[in-house]
Structure formats: C-alpha cells, structure tokens
Amino acid sequence: MKFSTILTGSLFATAALAAPLTEKRRARKEARAAGKRHSNPPYIPGSDKEILKLNGTTNEEYSSNWAGAVLIGDGYTKVTGEFTVPSVSAGSSGSSGYGGGYGYWKNKRQSEEYCASAWVGIDGDTCETAILQTGVDFCYEDGQTSYDAWYEWYPDYAYDFSDITISEGDSIKVTVEATSKSSGSATVENLTTGQSVTHTFSGNVEGDLCETNAEWIVEDFESGDSLVAFADFGSVTFTNAEATSGGSTVGPSDATVMDIEQDGSVLTETSVSGDSVTVTYV
C-alpha cells in the first residue's frame, strides 16, 4: 500500500490500528515457515494430546480441537466442500485459550489473537499416520481480521498459499485428492474472485494415508506447542460436501458429528443435512 506525503490524522490512526494485525499475520507466516503451525488429529477433551478414535457406532463425539463431520469407511480418495468466509471475533475462552490448568495446555500462550480454521481432509482419525488437508484460517485481534489459505500433509506442518486473496464473505471451494497413499493434491478456489491455487504432493511425505476417513472440519489448530485461542466464527456451512470412495460419490449424511469441548464447556454445535455440514460457535 502506498500513501501520499500528506496524511490526515485519521489515516495515521487507521494505519496504526492495522499495524498490530500486520505484525501478527507476519508472525504467523514466519511460524509456518519455521514449521510451527499445524493441524492435529482430534484430541479427547481434557487429555494430554490423547487421540480420539471414532468407531462409527455413535452419532456424536466431543473433541478438544475438531468440530464437523467425519466419515469412516474405505478407499476415500477425494473430499470437497464449499463455504462462505465468516465474520470472526474474539471467542469466549479468553486470551489464555484452552485448559490452562493441566497437562499439555498449562503453557498455553497469553494472546489477544483468536483463530479457527475450516478445512476438508482425508484421514487423521481412525488413521493416525497422515492427514491430507487444505483450508482457510481466520483470525481476529483488536477489531481486525485476517484470512489465510493453506495446505498440509500431516505430520508435516501447514504452509500458506501465497497467490490467493481471501476476504470475509468470499465463497471458497476446497478440495483434496489422493492419487496414491503418498501423493495427491490440495486446491483452494475463491469462487468470488476467480482465483485458484493448487499444491501437488509427489511422494516423499512423512506419513502414508490409509484412505479410511473423509472430513469437513472447523478446527482449533496448533501454533508452536499449544492450541490457539479459539475464535467466535458465527457459523461455517460446508455445502456441496462430497467424498469419493471406490469411484462413487458420497455425502456426509452417515458421518459421525463432532463438537469442540474445552474445560468442560461445549463451544460448537454441528449439524448435517443432505450434502451440507454446519458448524456453529455457541
């Protein structure tokens, strides 16, 4: 952004207001570059990073970091969904985030920044070795918001897409596709602006897929060694939610619903209807 040499006081104030977010956004990008921001499998609420393993026998489960819908089956090679980028604000969990009183979360960072992430993925629950995923982070601090598109092949870290701009209200389509258990692609399309970015994984990944899970998730992701303070995102609805298994397309109607529980409080409410998955902050 360029400014003229003569600035009014209001322009100076606007620039000053934007500065903290700019620094935080830069810090997040540097953290990604240093390998510090990543998603995780779903954790059991109140545990020290114990993975919640779904068995498909219950309609709803609670996790400390995942909300949304998870299909359990075999041969999932593609997952896609569309959502509108939400307005985001400070969450009710406070700047200390989740679980400052025990175990892994004792060292939760003190911060005024709140974030959440909407993504689609293959594996990560009943299959713990890998997650192929892509989505959008949305963050809030001091009245300012930012949105970043990313891709990840867990257990490696997440990496930003650099050639796409995302704003509140944009319609986004996210797709992951596995061409083998160690290769595939992640694509984010901004249907509002016409921009599209893809990252291709050509083997040499840190973990192989099992292709047993397909998911549409809003996550309280990890930065450094702790979960970020969870943002109030209103609601995110994945529409045209589809997964491909054995050449056939399936929707989320038979998925297990997951909601986020932290410190004894349920922070989300998830519902599935037809080909849509809605996650609401409560």
Curated annotation (Swiss-Prot):
Residues 19-59, 99-109 form a propeptide. GO terms for biological process: proteolysis. Its EC number is 3.4.23.19. InterPro entries: ConA-like_dom_sf, Peptidase_G1, Peptidase_G1_sf. Residues 27-46 are annotated as: Disordered. Disulfide bonds join C115-C139, C127-C210. Residues 1-18 form the signal peptide. It comes from the Eukaryota. Keywords: Aspartyl protease, Cleavage on pair of basic residues, Disulfide bond, Hydrolase, Protease, Pyrrolidone carboxylic acid, Signal, Zymogen. The modification Pyrrolidone carboxylic acid is found at Q110. It catalyses: Preferential cleavage in B chain of insulin: 3-Asn-|-Gln-4, 13-Gly-|-Ala-14, and 26-Tyr-|-Thr-27. Residues 27-39 have a biased composition (Basic residues). Heterodimer of two noncovalently bound light and heavy chains. Belongs to the peptidase G1 family. This is Aspergillopepsin-2. It comes from Aspergillus niger.
